Each structure stands twice: as C-alpha cells, then as structure tokens.
Amino acid sequence: MERFLRKYNISGDYANATRTFLAISPQWTCSHLKRNCLFNGMCVKQHFERAMIAATDAEEPAKAYKLVELAKEAMYDRETVWLQCFKSFSQPYEEDVEGKMKRCGAQLLEDYRKSGMMDEAVKQSALVNSERIRLDDSLSAMPYIYVPINDGQIVNPTFISRYRQIAYYFYNPDAADDWIDPNLFGIRGQHNQIKREVERQINTCPYTGYRGRVFQVMFLPIQLINFLRMDDFAKHFNRYASMAIQQYLRVGYAEEIRYVQQLFGRVPTGEFPLHQMMLMRRDLPTRDRSIVEARVRRSGDESWQSWLLPMIIIREGLDHQDRWEWFIDYMDRKHTCQLCYLKHSKQIPTCSVIDVRASELTGCSPFKMVKIEEHVGNDSVFKTKLVRDEQIGRIGDHYYTTNCYTGAEALITTAIHIHHWIRGSGIWNDEGWQEGIFMLGRVLLRWELTKAQRSALLRLFCFVCYGYAPRADGTIPDWNNLGNFLDIILKGPELSEDEDERAYATMFEMVRCIITLCYAEKVHFAGFAAPACEGGEVINLAAAMSQMWMEY
C-alpha cells in the first residue's frame, strides 16, 4: 500500500479513498455493468490489492491512476462504503489485532499532544468529583423550585437540610393548596428568612462539606428524605437539583428562551416563559392543575429518576392532548425510562428529540423525530441496525437512531453524544470506549467530510481515548462545559495534507480493529483469536501520558 502511494505520489483524499477501498475490496460484490472495472479480464474492484501490486511492479502509472480513480468514485456512494466496511471488518483474518491496536493507540497518544488537545487539557480546571454524573434534558427537578402555599402563606417545614448553596425545605405536599413563582414580591421576605435560617442551623453541607452562604431554596416532599440518605440516589438527585437552579437563574435573561425551547419544544408569548410552562393550568385527567402540582403530589421510589419530571412524556402531552394521561400514568407507576415506556407500554416506535445547541451550530431544525432502539445493556451499539444517514444517539440509558443529512450534522451530533456519555482514560478501559470509536468510525466512513471536519474528528478520537487520563499531578481535566468542549473540538487547528492522510489511516485502522474484535467476541472464527483485553491490562497506554505531561 505505502509503496504504491509513494511511487505514484498519491495523497490527500485520493490516498484516503485508496486505503479504504483496499480494506473492503475482498468482500466487494461487483456487477461489472460499466466494464470499467476490468483490467486484462480481472475485476480490480474485487481484486484491488492484486491490481495495485501488478501496477506497481510493472510501473504502469496510467493503470495506477485508473485504480485510484475507481477507488475515489466508489467513495461517492457512502452508504455502500459503510455496508461494505461493516461486512468486511466483521469477518476477521488471521492477524495481530492486539499489536495493531497498540500501534494505533500510540499514534493517537502522539496526536493528542500535537493536535492541541493536550494544551487544552492543561487549561481545564481539575475535576472535583471523578464519579461523573451524566445529566440530560430528558429529566428535570424544576418543579421543586416552586413555593408551596396555603392561604397565601408558605407551608410549614417538617425538616431542613442543604446541598452546597441550596437549602432543602421538606414539607408535606398535602398541606399545600397551590404552588407559586419564588420571585413574587409578596413572599420574598419569607423566602429570604428560610435561606438565613437554613444557613444558621446547617452551616456545613452534609453531602460535600461545603461551608458557605445559602442562595436558593428547593421545596421537597417529605417522602423524599429517606431516599436522600442513599449515596447513589443523593448523588444524582443533587446534581439535577443544581441544574434546575442554574436554569431558574436564567429567568428574565436571553438564555431563558433557549432553555424553555430545549425542555418543552415551544416558547409561550409574554414574560417569564419558564414559569408559564410550569404553572400554566393544564387539562389533566386528574384534579391537578399544573405539571408542578402533578409531579410534587406523586411520590417516587428508590430510583432517583422516579422523582424527576419526565420531559419527553411532557412534550407528548403538549403535542397530543389525549396523552396527558400518559404523564400521570408514568409517574403513578414509577417508571424510570421514558423511551422504554413509549416503546413497550404505548407501542410508540418514535419520539421527538430537541437539540437547540446543534441547531445553532448547523442551521438545521432543533426538532427531530427519532427511532427508539434498545435499552443500554440489552444490546450493544454494534448490533443496532443503521441504514442510510442514521446515527446513534442516547437519552438517559436508552439508545435511539436519528437522521443526519450532512457530515457537519453527524459530526456535531456525535460530539455532543460523546461529551455526555464517553470518558476516555486509556485504550480499552471500558465498553464506552469501544462505543465511542464505533460511532466516530460511522461518521468517518458514512459521510463525506472536509479536511477541517476530519481534523475535528481526530480530536474526538483523541478525546475518546485519552481525554480523561490523569495529568502529571494526578488530577483529571474537567470537560463538563459542553460549549467549551465543542469550541475546542470544532475550532482547533486544521491538519496539513500529510497530517490528514496519516490521521485518516490511524482512525481507519482503529475502527477496523474495533469492529473486528467486537464481532470476534461473539463469533468464533477458525484461525482467529481475539486478545483478552480486560481492565486495561493488555492495551492500556494512558500510563505513558505521565511522561508526556512533564513537558508542561
């Protein structure tokens, strides 16, 4: 391969096309209809390597360039390229896959340093909590910021606590007759008194040890108190509470409209659209007047998801009046996965997903109808059937497939997914790494990308493998800010032509090895043994970073 490319000075997109076609040629099925595939009676599409060797040995540049043109022409049909790649890579040959993975990992580690990703990792603050909580907009703790009142007075508390700067005010929901905006002038004095009293009685956060002022209040049902003593429950619920407060603090600012559209898919006219959507009188099948009241009056169980507001189900109710019953049923039965509920309980194969940020970056609509796939753990992403321009996405612990009509849209959609769900701290550290490489491979092979987009894709490959590897001082970079992360990925330096060619070869080889290994684990092929890659013992290159960090 390298001899052929260098001998005839093949570079750039033509070299990338030649590498790709060489890998899929053995399984390629050609109809020979155009007859341009036949060299001396041999189909070069099905015997590409033999034709390359013959053209090189015979020193026939005309035939060599024709081979390259055939490969480039084949790349125009990206759907066929993806299918042929998947077919070819899932049928492994006898080869040193482990060795190839190590070499690819070493090259990506070098690219991590040269691409500017390591410089950016140095600038990031240290991750305070290494157990990252994955938050998304499909669930919300927003109902708990609203103040429960009875006869115009705030309902008396039964217990108080705090999480960092947030006061937790526990009360009996049955004692309230309405819930109101916490910014209303008439209750500001009482609201401030609650903050001062919690700060006086509990000067240290029982969850984090934080000692400081209390600035906000969340009003929680007393039934929640015992579950907050469970570590995993408290860890997740507290983070959603913090996210709800951050959204609440944007009320009255320009960002409020973005938040409301992201959560509800529509923005009402007038002031304070967030409060309107939460407190608006709804025609619910129960006596509840608003979604806040419906949520707060219904207890969950030991699953933290069962206490939050299911935004996907809410949007179904907003779009179809008769589906408000689903909202009540979902909470009454304490479901934890909205996509499972829609797919299995309601036999709905699709749902609406909103991504305002991706819309702003690509110019496409923020609304997408997606196909609901399997729950995480039921099946791997490798067995998810992808057709035409589909790409995998994830809401909570459930996969879906969405249509991406351009390479830019596929790149940004995948980058957002990886930021939420993939934590790269070394080659083969967990299944998430395999999932990330597979999704990036789908983007690399299925869509036609520009050199700038492949440069961004390389940075994503580096992030998937090493983004969360410890720095020299043992700290882990904090990549939690999505906007900052996308700026680093999408606005980084563009690769030169030589760098682009080498990067493509590395990414392509890693994708090929990943698909080969994942299928080899499920099917036993004669003469092929997949390496036992467990716990990072076999192929973990992250340790090598400690020496590289010494330069900084």
Curated annotation (Swiss-Prot):
Name the domain of life this protein comes from. Answer: Viruses
Cited InterPro entries: Orbi_NS1
Q: Which is a Pfam family this sequence falls into?
A: Orbi_NS1
Q: Which family does it belong to?
A: Belongs to the orbivirus non-structural protein NS1 family.
What protein am I looking at?
Answer: Non-structural protein NS1
